[in-house]
Amino acid sequence: MTENRDNKTSQSEKTTQKKKKKKFKAFKIILITFITLIVISLVTAIGITLAIIKTSPDININEIIAASDASKIYDDKGELVDSIITSKKKILVKYDEVPENLINAFVSIEDERFFKHSGIDVKRIAGAFLIDMKNIVSGKPALQGASTITQQLIKNTVFETHGNSLNDKLRRKVQEWYLAPKLEKEVGKKSIMEAYLNTIYLGGRAIGVGAAADQYFNVSIDKLDLVQCAFIAGLPQSPSVYYPYSRTSKKDPSKYINRTKTVLAKMKENGYISQNEYISALAELDTSKSTVTNDESIQTLGQYTIHKPTNIDEKYNFEWFTRPAIERVKKDLKDIYNYSDDEIEKLLVNGNLKIYTTMNKDLQVSTQEIIDNDEKLNSLSSSKNNLVEPQASAVLTDYHTGEVKVIIGGRGTQPALAYNRATNAKVAAGSSIKPLTVYSAAIDSKLATAATVLEDSPLPEAMSKKYSAPGTNWQPKNANGVYSGYLGLRDALKNSVNVYAVKLEDKIGLNTGVKYGEKFGLTFDNVDKNSMAAIALGELNRGTNTFTMANAYGVFGNNGMYSNPRLYTKVLDRNGNVLLETKTQATQVISPEAAYIMYDLLKGPVKEGTATRIQHTYHSDIPIAGKTGSSTKFKNLWFCGLTPYYSGAVWIENKYGQSIYSSDAAALFGKIMNRAVENLPEKEIEMPEGIIKAEVDRVSGLLPTDLSYKDPRGSQVYTELFIKGTVPTEQDNIHVSTKVNKYNGRVSGSYTPSFLTESKVFIKRQSDSEVPLDDDMYVLPDKDKKSSNKSKHNHNNDAKHDNTNNSEDATNEASTEPSPNTDTVPEDSTNNLDPTKNTEKKPSDKKNKKHVIKPIIRPKKHF
């Protein structure tokens, strides 16, 4: 028994030992794995760090101090055309000239252990690391500052073009840690502080403390007192926030005043000033003068007046183009690298960037000359507030690439930062909007074709009310005051017929017009989006400009693609690295087929429509197309168009109602485009395969019949372009043939002798118009009207007179006069009488010499 027990105990101990061995083995494996991972991580981290360090740039203090060359601007051929005009001011100072209070103020607020560390502050880094860990866990932005003044100097002068992503920041931080001690060993603290104080941006125009002393207090650096030193030292953290003349500071100066107090508190904390000095300084800040005066152009800091920087009046060589290009570069730096405004400003002023624009210098120069010296504009020229009138703008774009080639923002000599009408104006587009929001929208959505016929006549009451304000009756007018009657889309666009555009927009829907307009790059406010006058006729509330319109019209030559406008191709940093680069980005706005049809339609105004004056100024064999536009009272005059090379827009501001029209804008456009293509080979835009040519009837927009060729105005058959699948399938139903009395033109009837009758072709109308229409004389005459067609065209455009000549309904009763040569033979109204009705001849009235017949009914199918 005892032996068995011992055996069991022995076996149990062995089992326990085995379990312990297994646990130890598992622990050993885990420990080895953990250590291995740590080692691998450390090795990897060291490797990455060494790799980052290896790519660190070489630096020396002389290059850092001199690293303030302004960025350069180049044209599309790589020729230097401008240098960044620095609004900044720099007054270099020596270390020994700087007040001790100013140095101590910067050290206290920016790097309190500056004179103790060797370039990096380990204690500060550790504190920042803990904060970063908390921020990462909580999802807040990580990477606290912890930068010493030495690191800031390196960052501001060496790494200014590096990105602001997390990876970029980590890389830059490692390189700063490596370079900072290296720099301190080479030059020492005084040289580093001097370089820092001379290169730091301090708001307004001030680069460096010398310029800041002059700008804010109008004193030299050695004359700054304690409060002034504290104010200047508080600026670097965020010069735009603490700048006294920012919008926020004008309303609430407490931001920069409280920042100054913070600097003073840190100076006291670090033992640089005494308690009494601190209290005295606060007292100076807390006087009644520390609030904004009634004059918001003057800011104060306690008892001190803070001077406002004077404006820079230096102009760029190519002011109209260079400034928009720089603004685009600024926007992209902010979007891509998340740079602050202050960082971008410093980079442009000191970064020695190379900005390659899309500007064609020769075209820019020639276009400015053409606009400045235009004979018609100069004949009307007057000077208002030292500004030549009328003003104008123009833009040319290579729509294939999106590269903007010309921007002209005004006429005549104008100052720096003058209002750029090409990029900043917001004016009504007039009829130049129609190809974008009406005709393209209708054709691309296949709700209409280039042959679609509508009646050019006053809006029906229901349609008018839909777009009228309560209690009003909106009726758009055509420019010539004439209504055409049946009208096709091609002719409506060619002659800029307003009523047709409104009716077509109503057919496709206002929202459709808005949607297409936005795809073309237009922007609408809520007023515009609900206004037929805005979307169909261009009476925009928000407005547009030549920059937008020039790029929009490029769609018609680019297979329906809208190329995002580009003002620069690339930006290089001082080391030749690509900082920014643009590529052609295009989006499909309309189909290639719709685009080509629109391009073909837009040749109409130039050849025989509203823009024929362009033929006197454009002499190239390269095709040109486009559309005029004018807003109410001819305040804004437009021509927007394209060739197979460029699209463009010209706008003339007729502010004072002078004798100038959209045709003058077309003539000006012709001069500009003539110069643009004069040395280019002849070229045409190719027609896509998805387009079909088909013969149609111009009056109905349908397939022609024999009567289409016999219209009294001549054959109404022509060849039109259609997107495949949109060719009409129905035959013309507007033309009719009937017999008429040769002598009075009225429809002959059963009593009209055959020798007095002849067959004629007419058009028929579904309903009568309240006003005369141009094609009334070709409408099938009613039985009850005497020379009704002719009488309508002998109108004087008076509404009351016009209404007396309206045709009556076919079922109305009436009497007819006999032909002068057939006194005893009354005329029937038609030879298509309803066979169920009888007509009866009554005795003639000798006195009135008239023959009266019974009422007749005209079958509806004939009308």
From Swiss-Prot:
Signal peptide: none annotated. Residues 837-846 have a biased composition (Basic and acidic residues). Residues 50-863 are extracellular. Keywords: Antibiotic resistance, Carboxypeptidase, Cell membrane, Cell shape, Cell wall biogenesis/degradation, Glycosyltransferase, Hydrolase, Membrane, Multifunctional enzyme, Peptidoglycan synthesis, Protease, Signal-anchor, Transferase, Transmembrane, Transmembrane helix. Residues 808-836 have a biased composition (Polar residues). The chain crosses the membrane at residues 29-49. Cell wall formation. Synthesis of cross-linked peptidoglycan from the lipid intermediates. The enzyme has a penicillin-insensitive transglycosylase N-terminal domain (formation of linear glycan strands) and a penicillin-sensitive transpeptidase C-terminal domain (cross-linking of the peptide subunits). This is Penicillin-binding protein 1A. It comes from Clostridium novyi (strain NT). The gene is pbpA.
